[in-house]
């Protein structure tokens, strides 16, 4: 493994007496003491979103990480996001409240297997969705997010074949939008692949005036019913601008917190999963809590560290993305 983290063995085991009663105040005090910035993804719990200095999707968080003057970056997200912050900020302390906050999509693309896959298609440009490990980024020519994937692919030479990894659903969506053939790695997100088309159609029958808005990581069977498809930021913006008053939201329901804050008079219904859950929460994103956020800042652990060779190789395609965005 090239990407490593410092072990948590130096931490005092979290106990009730380590957690202050007023976590918001304690975290804000630590933030000042450390000259820290808290970056949070839209899929985090509402209380983490509310204490964050910046909330956004993967592209916005990458841009924020690249431009911050803070000495410490506390990333309330999942591992690949904290890795990206470290790639962009090798001299800063980057903390992830829970090291187990992984990503099923990133896990679906093991570096060794992807290297073999890439070798089968010499001469291809490799476009990798940011939801991947540092090792995959290091094997890529350019990184993209759901916000800019179509824009990125449209700017690439027409005479060069393209490998797109790791999300097959986003890849299919990009193919449709750009009318370019892509060689797709067959990865997927556990949240977005389990929305129930049948239940979504039933909801639409129950609320005929509702608009279905969906993330492009969703399966094609769901996307074909969507009135609007976009990244989390795009979905948030659309929900504010649309005249509709009811939305069926086919992405991780953490984004609904911001939607309700921006337009409290509108109704947002999380799209149901195939199973009996009322909605699709990402179990990895939800591992982060205010308590873990506080402890990470208090003990300056767990810290993201990385092999410099991998970091430099991964930095180049990220920088290309930021330049082309």
Swiss-Prot record:
<dbReference type="Pfam" id="PF02445">
    <property type="entry name" value="NadA"/>
</dbReference>
<feature type="binding site">
    <location>
        <position position="58"/>
    </location>
    <ligand>
        <name>iminosuccinate</name>
    </ligand>
</feature>
<feature type="binding site">
    <location>
        <begin position="215"/>
        <end position="217"/>
    </location>
    <ligand>
        <name>iminosuccinate</name>
    </ligand>
</feature>
<feature type="binding site">
    <location>
        <position position="282"/>
    </location>
    <ligand>
        <name>[4Fe-4S] cluster</name>
    </ligand>
</feature>
<comment type="similarity">
    <text>Belongs to the quinolinate synthase family. Type 2 subfamily.</text>
</comment>
<dbReference type="InterPro" id="IPR003473">
    <property type="entry name" value="NadA"/>
</dbReference>
<dbReference type="GO" id="GO:0046872">
    <property type="term" value="F:metal ion binding"/>
</dbReference>
<keyword id="KW-0411">Iron-sulfur</keyword>
<comment type="pathway">
    <text>Cofactor biosynthesis; NAD(+) biosynthesis; quinolinate from iminoaspartate: step 1/1.</text>
</comment>
<comment type="function">
    <text>Catalyzes the condensation of iminoaspartate with dihydroxyacetone phosphate to form quinolinate.</text>
</comment>
<dbReference type="GO" id="GO:0051539">
    <property type="term" value="F:4 iron, 4 sulfur cluster binding"/>
</dbReference>
<keyword id="KW-0004">4Fe-4S</keyword>
<dbReference type="InterPro" id="IPR036094">
    <property type="entry name" value="NadA_sf"/>
</dbReference>
<feature type="binding site">
    <location>
        <position position="146"/>
    </location>
    <ligand>
        <name>iminosuccinate</name>
    </ligand>
</feature>
<dbReference type="GO" id="GO:0005829">
    <property type="term" value="C:cytosol"/>
</dbReference>
<feature type="binding site">
    <location>
        <position position="41"/>
    </location>
    <ligand>
        <name>iminosuccinate</name>
    </ligand>
</feature>
<keyword id="KW-0662">Pyridine nucleotide biosynthesis</keyword>
<dbReference type="InterPro" id="IPR023066">
    <property type="entry name" value="Quinolinate_synth_type2"/>
</dbReference>
<keyword id="KW-0808">Transferase</keyword>
<dbReference type="GO" id="GO:0008987">
    <property type="term" value="F:quinolinate synthetase A activity"/>
</dbReference>
<feature type="binding site">
    <location>
        <position position="103"/>
    </location>
    <ligand>
        <name>[4Fe-4S] cluster</name>
    </ligand>
</feature>
<protein>
    <recommendedName>
        <fullName>Quinolinate synthase</fullName>
        <ecNumber>2.5.1.72</ecNumber>
    </recommendedName>
</protein>
<dbReference type="GO" id="GO:0034628">
    <property type="term" value="P:'de novo' NAD biosynthetic process from L-aspartate"/>
</dbReference>
<keyword id="KW-0408">Iron</keyword>
<feature type="binding site">
    <location>
        <begin position="129"/>
        <end position="131"/>
    </location>
    <ligand>
        <name>iminosuccinate</name>
    </ligand>
</feature>
<feature type="binding site">
    <location>
        <position position="232"/>
    </location>
    <ligand>
        <name>iminosuccinate</name>
    </ligand>
</feature>
<keyword id="KW-0963">Cytoplasm</keyword>
<keyword id="KW-0479">Metal-binding</keyword>
<feature type="binding site">
    <location>
        <position position="189"/>
    </location>
    <ligand>
        <name>[4Fe-4S] cluster</name>
    </ligand>
</feature>
